[in-house]
């Protein structure tokens, strides 16, 4: 589905827990009709210890949301 929303556009979230937020689009996923919006739908993900990061820990990461839940600001 063709969309007018592109990477680095400013969008307003119109549905969900982050309703009303205005933020920048980090990525557009056209095959699944989803977008990743900066600071919206953030989840805490556990990271296993590795050689680079022997302690492991948690990171905060944005998950994609459906494109119908945002509009251009």
Curated annotation (Swiss-Prot):
Chain positions covered by the region annotation Disordered: 51-73
Basic and acidic residues: compositionally biased ranges: 51-65
A biological process term (GO) from this entry: translation
Alphabetically ordered keywords of this record: Ribonucleoprotein, Ribosomal protein, RNA-binding, rRNA-binding
Stored CDD domains: KOW_RPL26
GO cellular component: ribonucleoprotein complex; ribosome
Record InterPro entries: KOW, Rib_uL2_dom2, Ribosomal_uL24, Ribosomal_uL24_CS, Ribosomal_uL24_KOW, Translation_prot_SH3-like_sf
GO molecular function: rRNA binding; structural constituent of ribosome
Parts of the chain that traverse the membrane: none
Family label: Belongs to the universal ribosomal protein uL24 family.
Protein task: One of two assembly initiator proteins, it binds directly to the 5'-end of the 23S rRNA, where it nucleates assembly of the 50S subunit.
HAMAP family from the UniProt entry: Ribosomal_uL24_B
Protein name: Large ribosomal subunit protein uL24
Source organism (scientific name): Helicobacter pylori (strain Shi470)
């Amino acid at each position: 589905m063709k969309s007018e929303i592109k990477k680095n556009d400013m969008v307003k979230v119109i549905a969900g827990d982050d309703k009303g937020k205005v933020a920048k689009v980090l990525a557009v996923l056209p095959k699944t009709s989803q977008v990743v919006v900066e600071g919206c739908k953030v989840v805490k993900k556990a990271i296993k210890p590795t050689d680079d990061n022997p302690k492991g820990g948690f990171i905060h990461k944005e998950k994609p949301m459906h494109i119908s839940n945002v509009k251009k600001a």
